[in-house]
């Protein structure tokens, strides 16, 4: 039978662990990074332009199908991977979302994405988004990631 003091000590330890975990998530963790990853802060208005070229070429080579197994030459992927590596890890999906879907900035400026510009003829919006998400897969660019495999979804955007 546990004593009341043992239960109190256990509760205090659990509370301390939860407090430390919450503080770690808020400080440099992967909590709410929305403000940090906005266009004009960690994400530029024209993020990862080499990835735009790579996705457009991938659409052409693959005939508009993500599952075709056909991909552009590796030397076209390498500049894209370098640009993605320069984006903070927790902002990569946001940068790719801006690239694919575009965004309306806080100032009200519209930044068009690949979908609205029809920058990848032959690929529909879902395929373009899938190809962009696949760029964050470890096997593609060998980038460290936040724990997700690819970008689980693109939020917001204009398209």
Curated annotation (Swiss-Prot):
Disulfide bonds join 37-91, 51-80, 59-123, 81-141, 93-151. Its main location: secreted. Five disulfide bonds are present. Transmembrane segments: none annotated. It is found in: Secreted. Residues 1-24 form the signal peptide. One of its GO terms (molecular function) is IgE binding. One of its GO terms (cellular component) is extracellular region. Keywords: Allergen, Disulfide bond, Secreted, Seed storage protein, Signal, Storage protein. Seed storage protein. PANTHER family: 17KDA ALPHA-AMYLASE_TRYPSIN INHIBITOR 2, TRYPSIN/FACTOR XIIA INHIBITOR-RELATED. Belongs to the cereal trypsin/alpha-amylase inhibitor family. This is 17kDa alpha-amylase/trypsin inhibitor 2. The lineage of its organism: Eukaryota, Viridiplantae, Streptophyta, Embryophyta, Tracheophyta.
């Amino acid at each position: 039978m546990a004593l009341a003091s043992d239960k109190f000590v256990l509760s205090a330890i659990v509370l301390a662990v939860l407090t430390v975990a919450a503080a770690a998530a808020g400080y440099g963790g992967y909590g709410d990074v929305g403000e940090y990853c906005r266009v004009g802060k960690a994400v530029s208005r024209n993020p990862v332009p080499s990835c735009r070229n790579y996705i457009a070429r991938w659409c052409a080579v693959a005939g508009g199908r993500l599952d075709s197994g056909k991909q552009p030459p590796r030397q076209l992927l390498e500049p894209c991977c370098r640009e993605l590596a320069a984006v903070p890890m927790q902002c990569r999906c946001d940068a790719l979302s801006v690239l694919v879907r575009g965004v309306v900035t806080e100032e009200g400026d519209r930044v068009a994405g690949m979908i609205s510009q029809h920058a990848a003829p032959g690929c529909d919006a879902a395929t373009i988004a899938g190809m962009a998400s696949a760029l964050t897969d470890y096997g593609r660019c060998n980038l460290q990631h936040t724990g997700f495999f690819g970008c689980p979804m693109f939020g917001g955007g204009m398209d």
